[in-house]
Amino acid sequence: TWNRQGDWLERIEKALYHTDIFLPSYQEAVQITGERDVQAMGKMLRRYGISIFGVKMGEQGSYVTDFQKEYFIPPFATEKVVNTVGAGDSYVAGFLTAQIKGMGLYESAVFASAVAAFTVQTMGAVGGVPSADVVEEFIRKQKR
């Protein structure tokens, strides 16, 4: 939830010690860490034992690291943007789906970005979320 007092870290710190994958939005990560650089955010949060840290940055794409490798993932081009509601949640769902399917860090972030690209092209938070097979075909057809 949004917190205007600026004590985000204090509110979630105990949970961070039990978090393996942490994928906040850029704005959330700034509020939590006080940092503006995504790499500095990751360094600060690593002390909690997080295995994978990523930042969703909307039209700037995303950043993801396992603290050994790091990737900046550009967003997929879309024909139109109808509504961005749910894009971040779709990104997280896509990332976790890819991890469960055994994909690596980079592939998971690309998969997540593709799911978010589908989401922004339709009205509503979940109306545009396709099956994993459709997402994989979409990725194969892209020039990246």
Residue locations for each model-derived region?
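Conserved phosphate-binding/catalytic region of the ribokinase-like
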Residues: L9, V38-R144
